[in-house]
A protein has these predicted regions:
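Juxtamembrane intracellular "pre-TM" segments in multi-pass secondary transporters
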Residues: 1-24, 46, 50
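Pair of pore-lining "gating" transmembrane helices in MFS-fold secondary transporters
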Residues: 15-40, 123
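Short amphipathic helix-loop junctions that connect adjacent transmembrane helices
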Residues: 38-60
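Helix-to-loop junctions at the C-terminal end of transmembrane segments
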Residues: 73-88
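C-terminal ends and interior cores of transmembrane alpha-helices
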Residues: 97-112
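Hydrophobic core of transmembrane alpha-helices in multi-pass small-molecule transporters
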Residues: 114-132
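Intracellular juxtamembrane helix-capping segments at the cytosolic ends
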Residues: 130-147
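A late C-terminal transmembrane helix in Major Facilitator Superfamily
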Residues: 147-168
Length: 168
């Protein structure tokens, strides 16, 4: 009945031109960001002798606090001016590049400078993520209106694939 119809409508968004590209990009972005959370703890918590950083739970917690604070600053301060200057269409790939750069830099942190390096990398990752979410939602809204597609269906499809990416 209704659930089946809702699922079919959401699934149909995965084949709708510009909308599907953003939805798939969102899925890949969320998947990568979720994997970072899991693997980051393994890397930082691994003993120095095994190639990790030997961090404890409190040290990891501080790094994740930096990610959270940087995300708040990004969405509370940076997103407005950058959106007006660049627009969502340019910010989406820029946000992927920024976040991707941060993710690539994580394994290159060196134990003797780990805290400073990880704080900088965490800020880079958080800024990229903080720019991605609003940009992708804004673009989806614009494309849905332009193509005359129900906004609820489009946003529901985006949230569905985001949830699926977190499960993977």
């Amino acid at each position: 009945g209704r659930l089946s119809k809702s699922f079919k409508q959401s699934y149909s968004m995965l084949n709708k031109g510009s909308i599907s590209i953003i939805i798939w990009a969102t899925m890949l972005f969320i998947f990568g960001f979720t994997i970072m959370h899991a693997v980051f703890i393994l890397y930082t918590g691994m003993p120095l002798s095994d190639g990790g950083l030997g961090y404890n739970e409190a040290q990891n917690g501080r790094i994740f606090a930096v990610i959270g604070i940087a995300g708040i600053v990004t969405q509370g301060v940076l997103i407005g001016p950058l959106s007006r200057k660049l627009g969502a269409r340019r910010m989406l790939p820029l946000s992927c590049f920024i976040c991707g750069t941060g993710l690539v830099l994580i394994p290159y942190t060196q134990a003797e400078y780990a805290t400073v390096q990880l704080v900088l990398v965490a800020i880079i990752v958080a800024v990229g993520s903080g720019l991605f979410q609003p940009s992708s939602s804004s673009l989806l809204t614009t494309f849905a209106k332009h193509e005359g597609i129900n906004l609820g269906i489009v946003m529901g499809a985006q949230e569905s694939v985001s949830s699926f990416a977190r499960i993977l």
